[in-house]
Design a protein with these regions (language model features):
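Phosphate-binding site of ATP-dependent enzymes
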Residues: 184-249, 254-263, 267, 283-285
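ATP-dependent carboxylate activation and anion-phosphoryl transfer catalytic cores
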Residues: 4, 10, 73, 242-246, ...
Length: 346
């Protein structure tokens, strides 16, 4: 088969290394990977065939730089991996494709709803998809009153900015957790914060941030990672997440969940999502929706990023993708670990 060139953005993100490795291990053709990142000291700079520095996704120079790289490298496919870049890429899909590639991204509307948790929760409120009860606040007074409406201080509540990557800005507001225990017995990264601590930070701040306050939901932490096309789920691995460290789960286990599959199918259909997405659930509650690839569990014979690329290039049909569902192995486990590379920086 013809050699394939893939432009992989955010080639230093936590899920990049296994995606690069799995694409390079494809047997039926040679795949050349061109990586981009905002930092030259990332794994992608060493594992990709070629590597280019880019500005941050919110920079006005980001899209022109991507176009420059596309015109230079002539990739067949652009595969985005970062929430910080996905809105810019979706908003400029036509420009990027005019430069000479196919872009694996959902519609601009679907991406913007997915990335804004206020819009996401509002969109699915009173739908078959459960979302936490929430309030959007922009002042200290609203924060305090909304926290009380959601059950604080008798029950903990959560908050985070409507736009944020992963666990950035996420905290659990609770006065029941010992500060002494957090300092002496927990890792330095703790989600818990008391109202007094919150007041110390924001009480005298003239510019109160936009925040989303949510009820504190509990249950098994799972994500679904469907490959979708035109609002339809073609196959959908579901994994539980364990052993979180610094905001990243370190272990994943492939599981079955008809309920989460049904919720994911409704999400995909309603938003008319495309390609690989990632939906995070706590119990039955949708917590986060990433309209991009996230950490994958690779099973023998099942390489979802490569399937998505072939589907985008019309080398396979949706039915052929559906047939691959039988290759999802329940119980297949992935453990994330730290590794190192060594190089001469001269």
């Amino acid at each position: 088969m013809e050699e394939l060139r893939v432009l992989l953005t955010a080639a230093g993100c936590p899920g990049a290394a296994p995606v690069i490795r799995q694409l390079k291990q494809v047997d039926e053709r040679s795949i050349e990977i061109i990586g981009t990142d905002i930092d030259q000291y990332k794994i992608g700079a060493h594992w990709c065939d070629r590597f280019h520095l880019v500005p941050k996704g919110g920079s006005p120079e980001f899209i022109p730089r991507l176009i420059e790289i596309i015109e230079l490298e002539r990739p067949h496919v652009l595969l985005p991996q970062s929430s910080a870049e996905i809105i810019a890429i979706a908003s400029n899909k036509e420009l990027l494709e005019a430069a000479g590639t196919k872009v694996m991204v959902a519609s601009e509307k679907a991406v913007k709803i997915s990335e804004n948790k206020d819009e996401l929760y509002s969109f699915f409120k009173d739908s078959p998809v459960k979302v936490p009860e929430f309030r959007h606040v922009s002042s200290l007074e609203q924060f305090v009153s909304s926290s009380e409406e959601l059950g604080y201080p008798d029950n903990p509540v959560c908050f985070k900015p409507p736009f944020s990557k992963g666990s950035r800005g996420f905290r659990i507001l609770s006065d029941d957790v010992s500060r002494k225990e957090i300092i002496l017995k927990q890792r330095p990264f703790s989600y818990f914060i008391s109202m007094n601590e919150f007041m110390d930070v924001f009480g005298k701040d003239d510019e109160f941030p936009e925040l989303l306050i949510m009820e504190y939901v509990q249950g098994v932490d799972c994500t679904t990672d469907p490959l979708t096309r035109k609002g339809e789920v073609l196959l959908c691995p579901i994994k539980s997440r364990h052993n979180e460290r610094c905001g990243l789960p370190m272990k994943f286990v492939q599981v079955e969940s008809p309920e989460l599959l049904e919720s994911t199918s409704h999400i995909v259909k309603t938003l008319e999502l495309d390609w690989i997405i990632n939906a995070q659930f706590i119990g039955e509650y949708l917590i986060e929706l990433n309209p991009r690839i996230s950490t994958q569990i690779f099973a023998p014979g099942l390489n979802i990023p490569y399937l998505a690329i072939k589907l985008l290039l019309e080398e396979i049909t949706p039915d052929e993708v559906r047939d691959c569902s039988s290759k999802i192995i329940i119980g297949q486990t992935s453990v994330r670990y730290y590794n190192q590379i060594f190089f001469d920086d001269n």
